[in-house]
Amino acid sequence: MGPYLPAILRPIGRYATLYNVPRVAGQLRCYAADAKDAADAQGESAADPRVAELEKQLADKSKEAADLKDRLLRSVADFRNLQEVTRRDVQKARDFALQRFSKDLLESLDNFGHALGAVSPEALQRSPEIADLHAGVRLTRDVFEKTLLKHGIAPIDALGQPFDPNLHEATFELPQPDKTPGTVFHVQQPGYTLNGRVIRPAKVGVVKDPDA
C-alpha cells in the first residue's frame, strides 16, 4: 500500500515528484483562496439579516426616544402654562377682593369728609367744643388716609388738573372766566387709586368753554 496522497495529488499519483510540486502548490493556494472567499461570502450572507435587524431596532428606538422627548417637552410647556394661568387667576382674585374691600373703606372715609363739611366756619368760631370735636375728627380722618396710603390706596389729585376721563367723572360743567376751559374747578367726591389702578374716579365739575 503506497503513501497517502491529498485529493489534489491523487490524479498525479506517483508522478507527484519534485518537478511538479510548484504547480501543485499553486493549485492548492487557488483552491484555498476560493474556499476562504466562499466562507467569507457565506458568513456575510448569514450576518446581513442580523445586522439589518439590529439597525432596524436601533432606528425604532431612536424614533421612540425622539417621541418621548417631544412629549416630555410638551408636558413641561403645558405645566408651565398652567402655572402662569393659575398665578394670574390667583392674582386677579386677590386684586378683586382687595378692590372690593378698598371701596368699602372709602365709604367710611367719605363719612369723615361729610362730617367735617357739615360744620360751618361760624360754628367753629362760636363754640370751642365744636372746634375741638372738629379737630379730632379731622385728625382721625388724616390718620385713616395715611393708613390707606401705606397699603397702596392713594387719592387722585384732581383740582386744577385737565379733565381726564380715565381719572375723573364729570358731573357738571360751568363757565369760569378766570379758569382754563376743560380743567377741574370743583371736586364733588374724591377719587382713589389702588396700586396705581383707579378704583373710583373723582366726581368733578369741569370748566366749560363759553365759545363751545
Curated annotation (Swiss-Prot):
SUPFAM superfamilies: Coiled-coil domain of nucleotide exchange factor GrpE (SSF58014), Head domain of nucleotide exchange factor GrpE (SSF51064)
A GO BP annotation: protein refolding
Subunit-level organization: Component of the PAM complex, at least composed of mtHsp70, MGE1, TIM44, PAM16, PAM17 and PAM18.
Family recorded in the similarity comment: Belongs to the GrpE family.
Domain of life: Eukaryota
GO MF term (any one): unfolded protein binding
Pfam families: GrpE
Function (record text): Essential component of the PAM complex, a complex required for the translocation of transit peptide-containing proteins from the inner membrane into the mitochondrial matrix in an ATP-dependent manner. Seems to control the nucleotide-dependent binding of SSC1 to substrate proteins.
The protein, known as: GrpE protein homolog, mitochondrial
Localization: Mitochondrion matrix
Keyword Transit peptide appears in the UniProt entry: yes
Keywords: Chaperone, Mitochondrion, Transit peptide
Gene Ontology annotations for the cellular component aspect, listed alphabetically: PAM complex, Tim23 associated import motor
InterPro entries: GrpE, GrpE_coiled_coil, GrpE_head
